[in-house]
Amino acid sequence: SLIVGLTLSPASFAEEKKEEKKKEEPKPQSVFKDKALEEGVRKFVFAKRYNKEPLVEADLIHLSTIKVTNAGIKDLSGLEKCRALASLDLAGNEISDFNAIKDLKRIQYLNLAKNKIEDVSPIAGLTALQYIELSNNRVKDLKPLEKLSNMRSLYLSNNRIIDFSPALKLTKL
């Protein structure tokens, strides 16, 4: 009877271990879909600068500056998690849609020069903006910028703008 008990114990122990393995947490997924953006942002996340662990929301909440230029970035999803962002430089990429930053109210400096941007409406509510570089894009309409009352520097050369009158409402330029 004692021998039988010992024989059963290892088997039941092995079953318990199998159950434990099934309950393991799923591996964290990066908040970024665009690998070039993730690699660029990684340089600004001190704890993960030299490893390949996925960047998760907790890594990004205190980031104030991101600069990733000429990296072939297309998709900005994930940047919406960077709530403390004050300076964003993504010049020289392949960006056409930058809706991901539309709620980042602390941004003061934004460089999106040399991209494929046509619609600037995502920045209409970013009232802390003081500097915008949008040269060498495909921007046509400046109306979304007219309420950015803190704007001090606005660069728009080499775009498709017909009407500059919304920029005239920016009194600090």
Predicted region positions:
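Consensus positions within tandem repeat domains that build extended binding/scaffold surfaces
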Residues: N111, E133-N136, Y155-N158
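N-terminal capping/linker segments that flank leucine-rich repeat
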Residues: L2-D89, E94, N99-A100, K105-Y109, ...
